[in-house]
Amino acid sequence: MRSAQVYRWQIPMDAGVVLRDRRLKTRDGLYVCLRDGEREGWGEISPLPGFSQETWEEAQTALLTWVNDWLQGSEGLPEMPSVAFGASCALAELTGVLPEAADYRAAPLCTGDPDDLVLRLADMPGEKIAKVKVGLYEAVRDGMVVNVLLEAIPDLHLRLDANRAWTPLKAQQFAKYVNPDYRARIAFLEEPCKTRDDSRAFARETGIAIAWDESLREADFTFEAEEGVRAVVIKPTLTGSLDKVREQVAAAHALGLTAVISSSIESSLGLTQLARIAAWLTPGTLPGLDTLHLMQAQQIRPWPGSALPCLKREELERLL
């Protein structure tokens, strides 16, 4: 016997979270809980403003329609990426497809003061990998910060994310301030330039490896082995169903590329599922999931070791 619940939620964000020139004051989303007999599965649907094609309201309408169809015996999935991902996660939990084992390691995210990152990395066991957002300030400043970090911590490898912020000139200004001896310890730089061709040229000219992120969601993108391209960053909330995520990981691995499962600032419930997906599909690769500290609360399932309060399902607004 099938049954389902849908919850709507809103989590206050820390001050200072900016996405594509928009301040994100709250993280808004939905949960679906599917039941079939004794089994239960949860999924999170939280379109990311400025990045997702669909709005929260559109996702809610699509989710409620899909849930009602599922209750009637339908086996299909919704079209919208965030809804397809959340629904497929709920089904994967319900059927036991999604393993419980999780990779709760996360590459620490530095959005501001590099000194904070140095302190966090000092306590990090094993491989030291961190992520730094670049492109928010002057390219020269970004280059200097990256150089300081690589100089201060000799065993550090950095993942950088520019979100296509730079012109070729700005990208070259950044590279100019990174010591050529340190560039090999930049694991990759996500989408440095506004176009793929400019990003490819940057990689060739500087020796700094790049990764595709936004490109994966463009209609003309194909997986290819290319000089200077080392990785793909997969954000499941923006990608679609779990099957589509698995296809992209497999395509990347077939070409010898690193595939990194990455957060779209999901709640703790969604992040714990991403940690399980990472352990399952990309074992041995550190996922990019260090976004919980941007929020003021957790929900339903806590992230191990987090001191943030965790809300229970009874405290959420139920829609169905």
UniProtKB/Swiss-Prot annotation:
Top-level taxonomy: Bacteria, Pseudomonadati, Pseudomonadota, Gammaproteobacteria, Enterobacterales
Organism listed in the record: Salmonella heidelberg (strain SL476)
Record carries keyword DNA damage: no
Known catalytic reactions: (1R,6R)-6-hydroxy-2-succinyl-cyclohexa-2,4-diene-1-carboxylate = 2-succinylbenzoate + H2O
GO molecular function: magnesium ion binding; O-succinylbenzoate synthase activity
CDD domains, per the entry: OSBS
E.C. number: 4.2.1.113
Active-site residues, Swiss-Prot/TrEMBL: 133, 235
Name the record gives this protein: o-succinylbenzoate synthase
Family that this chain belongs to: Belongs to the mandelate racemase/muconate lactonizing enzyme family. MenC type 1 subfamily.
